[in-house]
């Protein structure tokens, strides 16, 4: 009895359904459900701009006339799931999968056949359908949408002129390309219909764009195509990767099985040491590996060949719809691609003003309408944002379960791949959407147990896969870097950021190419910071070794120059000639010389680290006041290690990863499930996102959750607030970084911009960076113009200072509206004024430049009245007139209204929050306080702002 009780603690109860079966049933039940179940990705219906009653009438009229239209098929697809026997085809078999890209419909909407239940109205269209306020009705649809072509399947449409104009406008962009036959769209193939080859490729590209249903995967393909620099560069990269893989495997097989190494000493030619028919005499393990790699290579080849069609579609999309040729893809910026995507979205309207905002909140709108820079970044980084938050909040337990290495974390590329396989593939479905089952606490225990079993299973699989990966990567690394190290031995000590450092430095909604550019710019400053610290003993030994090895190498080199024929063959030791020792001494001299710093370097580690923080945006709270200490250097050195050490850790991680998956990660499975449930929000039209990645542009920095020592009294920390906040100012830095990358439209100003001469600081002298004007070097951090923990970085970090930035010629006291953001995403100046009042004395340095003379005021061509706190009074008054406009610039002109509210039923709550912001801005005095300040201002005769 006792043994059975013990086993029951580890084994699932008999008869209970598997968690994977529950997930599959839940996904199948929500496949055709409404907006909330499908995470905001509603079916793209051509007639979605009409009301419920209009859609019902149009559908009924279309069925009476036995017309099959795209809208009818799409509405039928939105029904609740039927029984398996009802969904099966007449032959009883499943429908054949289409070879279309993953962002296209698996089958054309017209491929479905009508049945007896087509008159049933979908549940998603019954929301408030019983109201009698929707009186307009549509007449029967015309018999033919295009009189010139009777064979084309017509679509139901209105006959009134206003609605007909909108109908035709919508139909122009989603009209399928013409063909010589009347077959449905989903059955058009160029092989069966040769006439399709003559169709305008722009129309075909427009038709594909209009029929994109999985916008996440489509935008991901668009971004990967952008990173790959076009179709030809992508194809060339894949061909070279296949050739590289074949060369590494083939050459490794040749070196290990086809050479008789004992004969090398007494042989003179290659034929003397070759093993005849070496492949036939290989061992069983070598033969198995060779066949395994061969099948993998053939599989990748077929995968690349089948993927050419998708690449061609992306090429047509860039060329014909975005106007970007294959050559321009290599030079165009991603911001320009985003602007053209938004222009393409605006040229294909899918939301009409006839539908009230109340109905749009419930029914949702076309997901393509949510496609500005913020929404695109959230779609592309839906999974990455969760990973950034997991690393930032230390949810993952990656400690090595080894007695002498328990304090060391293991995070390598192999571990990253396992986390994506175990966690992300478990939480997200094939469409990249978060499974709503994880948002229900009723399944917490089952989901946690399932995640724990996935970790254990992945650890077992790593044992079988690790030997093959270790052999391949060791050979690949040897072939790639050995020649480089031989030519430049100093590169052996070169450093790079670890995978853990990349996830710590990366910000929310920061795409990979933007993050890579920022990190690459930080490498010179990181190397200089590491070299700053005093290592006097190491430097003395290195200089001594460099002197001895250099002297020996110089004598041997001079002797070989005097008599090369005699001296190069001279053996200094047994079978070791002068040439051999020249290589040895030269390598030792180069390595020792690389350890010694330049004699002209200036020692200032604090300044070097501040320069580095401007790019990494990583400033833990524990570093405050200790930037000069060796402990901070050790913490940073863990994130910035030598390349050879990172490679060895990658190899060793393939051995230790199973132990982490077995013993460490299962301990945090409960926290992982809780994390996805508690830090997930729903955004209409986009889906479920990480709460930290959804920037509240309406209120600026007032509501950005931060956890830093400067935020409040450390003795009065609110544990709940800290739990739902990011660490080290991650979210605020991400907010400012996002505005730096996409806020390209600057505010108009009456002053003429002043462009100072370029700053050219040297890496060896901090005086060229702006501190030369200071008479004495202060020691405390605040007077060094350094960032504080949790504060923003970059150009936007000047918001809230008493002096505007000198560089760039524009004012950054409030963020400027951007053409890459929709009106509801425009940053609000209200939140930035309140944020400025919280910390008016924070002087942040910009990574784009630094003032040479901090004591001098910026040069302005025209004087403008300023308030006492140094801010432009006209800007403050204009912000006061706007009050608490939560949508920023241009909200009233938005045709979206409030249809994109994250919580459609929280109108009263938002109004209450905005009222609280008014009190905060006014200084907390309320209405009486405002009246008192206004009377005081009138008595003093001032015309400046009164604190509003």
UniProtKB/Swiss-Prot annotation:
Polar residues: bias regions: 66-79
Residue ranges, compositional bias (Low complexity): 878-892
Residue spans of biased composition, Basic residues class: 844-853
Amino acid composition bias (Acidic residues), ranges on this chain: 907-917
Topology relative to the membrane: Multi-pass membrane protein
Keywords for the protein's UniProt record, in alphabetical order: Autophagy, Cytoplasmic vesicle, Endoplasmic reticulum, Golgi apparatus, Lipid transport, Membrane, Phosphoprotein, Transmembrane, Transmembrane helix, Transport
Segments on the Lumenal side according to the record's topology features: 252-287, 565-576
Reactions that this protein is recorded to catalyse: a 1,2-diacyl-sn-glycero-3-phosphocholine(in) = a 1,2-diacyl-sn-glycero-3-phosphocholine(out); a 1,2-diacyl-sn-glycero-3-phospho-L-serine(in) = a 1,2-diacyl-sn-glycero-3-phospho-L-serine(out); a 1,2-diacyl-sn-glycero-3-phosphoethanolamine(in) = a 1,2-diacyl-sn-glycero-3-phosphoethanolamine(out); a 1,2-diacyl-sn-glycero-3-phospho-(1D-myo-inositol-3-phosphate)(in) = a 1,2-diacyl-sn-glycero-3-phospho-(1D-myo-inositol-3-phosphate)(out)
Domain remark text: Forms a homotrimer with a solvated central pore, which is connected laterally to the cytosol through the cavity within each protomer. Acts as a lipid scramblase that uses its central pore to function: the central pore opens laterally to accommodate lipid headgroups, thereby enabling lipid flipping and redistribution of lipids added to the outer leaflet of atg9-containing vesicles, thereby enabling growth into autophagosomes.
Job description of the protein: Phospholipid scramblase involved in autophagy and cytoplasm to vacuole transport (Cvt) vesicle formation. Cycles between the preautophagosomal structure/phagophore assembly site (PAS) and the cytoplasmic vesicle pool and supplies membrane for the growing autophagosome. Lipid scramblase activity plays a key role in preautophagosomal structure/phagophore assembly by distributing the phospholipids that arrive through atg2 from the cytoplasmic to the luminal leaflet of the bilayer, thereby driving autophagosomal membrane expansion. Required for mitophagy.
Name under which the protein is recorded: Autophagy-related protein 9
Organism annotation: Penicillium rubens (strain ATCC 28089 / DSM 1075 / NRRL 1951 / Wisconsin 54-1255) (Penicillium chrysogenum)
Encoding gene per record: atg9
């Amino acid at each position: 009895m006792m043994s059975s009780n013990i086993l029951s603690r580890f084994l699932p109860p008999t008869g209970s359904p598997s968690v994977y079966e529950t997930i599959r049933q839940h996904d199948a039940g929500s496949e055709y459900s409404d907006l909330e179940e499908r995470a905001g990705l509603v079916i793209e219906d051509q007639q979605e701009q009409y009301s419920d009653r209009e859609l019902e009438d149009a559908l009924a009229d279309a069925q009476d006339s036995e017309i099959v239209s795209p809208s009818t098929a799409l509405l039928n697809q939105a029904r609740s799931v039927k029984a398996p026997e009802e969904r099966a085809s007449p032959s009883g078999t499943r429908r054949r999968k289409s070879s279309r890209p993953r962002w296209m419909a698996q089958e054309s909407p017209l491929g479905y056949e009508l049945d007896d239940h087509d008159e049933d109205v979908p549940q998603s269209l019954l929301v408030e359908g019983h109201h009698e306020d929707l009186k307009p009705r549509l007449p029967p649809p015309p018999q033919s949408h295009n009189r010139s072509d009777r064979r084309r399947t017509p679509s139901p449409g209105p006959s009134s002129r206003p609605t007909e104009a909108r109908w035709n406008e919508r139909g122009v962009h989603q009209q399928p390309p013409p063909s010589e036959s009347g077959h449905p769209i989903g059955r058009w193939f160029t092989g069966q219909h040769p006439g399709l080859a003559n169709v305008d490729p722009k129309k075909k590209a427009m038709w594909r764009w209009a029929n994109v249903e999985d916008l996440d995967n489509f935008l991901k393909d668009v971004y990967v195509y952008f990173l790959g620099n076009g179709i030809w560069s992508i194809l060339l990269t894949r061909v070279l990767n296949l050739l590289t893989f074949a060369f590494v495997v083939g050459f490794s097989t040749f070196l290990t099985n086809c050479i008789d190494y004992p004969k090398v000493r007494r042989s003179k030619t290659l034929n003397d040491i070759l093993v005849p028919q070496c492949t036939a005499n290989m061992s069983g393990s070598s033969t198995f590996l060779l066949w395994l790699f061969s099948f993998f290579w053939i599989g990748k080849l077929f995968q690349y060949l089948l993927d050419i069609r998708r690449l061609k579609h992306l090429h047509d999309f860039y060329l014909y719809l975005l106007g970007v040729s294959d050559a321009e893809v290599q030079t165009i910026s991603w911001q320009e691609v985003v602007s053209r995507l938004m222009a393409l979205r605006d040229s294909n309207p899918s939301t009409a003003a006839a539908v009230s905002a109340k109905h749009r909140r419930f029914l949702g709108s076309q997901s393509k309408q949510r496609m500005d820079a913020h929404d695109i970044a959230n779609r592309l980084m839906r999974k990455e944002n969760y990973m950034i938050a997991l690393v930032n909040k230390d949810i993952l337990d990656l400690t090595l379960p080894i007695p002498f290495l328990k304090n060391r974390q293991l995070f390598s590329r192999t571990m990253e791949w396992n986390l994506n396989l175990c966690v992300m593939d478990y939480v997200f479905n094939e469409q990249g959407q978060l499974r709503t089952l994880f948002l229900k606490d009723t399944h917490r225990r089952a989901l946690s147990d399932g995640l724990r079993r996935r970790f254990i299973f992945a650890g077992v699989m790593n044992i079988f896969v690790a030997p093959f990966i270790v052999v391949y990567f060791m050979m690949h690394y040897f072939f790639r870097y050995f020649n480089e190290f031989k030519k430049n031995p100093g590169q052996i000590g070169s450093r790079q950021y670890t995978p853990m450092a990349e996830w710590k430095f990366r910000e929310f909604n920061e795409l990979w190419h933007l993050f890579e550019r920022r990190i690459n710019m930080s490498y010179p400053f990181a190397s200089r910071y590491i070299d700053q610290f005093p290592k006097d003993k190491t430097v003395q030994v290195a200089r001594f070794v460099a002197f001895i090895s250099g002297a020996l190498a110089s004598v041997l080199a001079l002797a070989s120059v005097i008599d090369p024929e005699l001296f190069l063959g001279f053996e200094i030791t047994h079978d070791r000639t002068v040439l051999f020792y020249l290589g040895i001494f030269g390598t030792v001299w180069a390595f020792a010389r690389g350890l010694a710093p330049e004699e002209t370097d200036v020692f200032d580690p604090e300044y070097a680290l501040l320069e580095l923080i401007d790019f990494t945006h990583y400033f833990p709270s524990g570093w405050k006041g200790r930037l000069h200490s060796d402990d901070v250097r050790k913490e940073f050195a863990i994130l910035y290690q030598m390349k050879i050490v990172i490679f060895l850790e990658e190899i060793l991680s393939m051995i230790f990863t199973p132990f982490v998956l077995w013993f460490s990660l299962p301990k945090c499975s409960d926290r992982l499930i809780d994390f996805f449930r508690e830090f997930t929000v729903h955004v209409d039209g986009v889906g479920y996102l990480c709460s930290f990645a959804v920037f509240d542009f309406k209120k600026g920095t007032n509501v950005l959750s931060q956890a830093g020592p400067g935020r409040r009294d450390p003795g009065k920390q609110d544990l709940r607030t800290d739990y739902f906040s990011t660490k080290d100012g991650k979210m605020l830095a991400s907010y400012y970084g996002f505005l730096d990358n996409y806020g390209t439209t600057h505010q108009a100003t009456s002053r003429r911009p002043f462009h100072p001469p370029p700053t050219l600081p040297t890496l060896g002298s901090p005086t060229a960076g702006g501190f030369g004007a200071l008479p004495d070097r202060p020691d405390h951090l605040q007077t060094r113009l350094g960032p504080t923990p949790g504060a923003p970085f970059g150009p936007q970090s000047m918001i809230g200072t008493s002096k505007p930035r000198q560089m760039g010629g524009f004012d950054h006291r409030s963020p400027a509206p951007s053409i890459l953001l929709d009106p509801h995403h425009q940053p609000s100046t209200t939140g930035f004024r309140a944020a400025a009042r919280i910390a008016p004395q924070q002087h942040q340095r910009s990574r784009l430049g630094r003032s040479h003379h901090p004591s001098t005021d910026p040069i302005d061509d025209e004087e403008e009245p300023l308030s006492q706190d140094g801010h432009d009074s006209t800007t403050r008054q204009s912000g006061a007139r706007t009050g608490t406009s939560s949508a920023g610039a241009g909200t009233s002109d938005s045709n979206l209204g409030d249809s994109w509210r994250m919580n459609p039923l929280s109108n009263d709550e938002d109004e209450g929050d905005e009222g609280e912001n008014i009190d905060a801005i006014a200084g907390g005095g309320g209405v009486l306080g405002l009246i008192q300040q206004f009377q005081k201002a009138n008595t003093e005769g001032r015309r400046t702002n009164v604190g509003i």
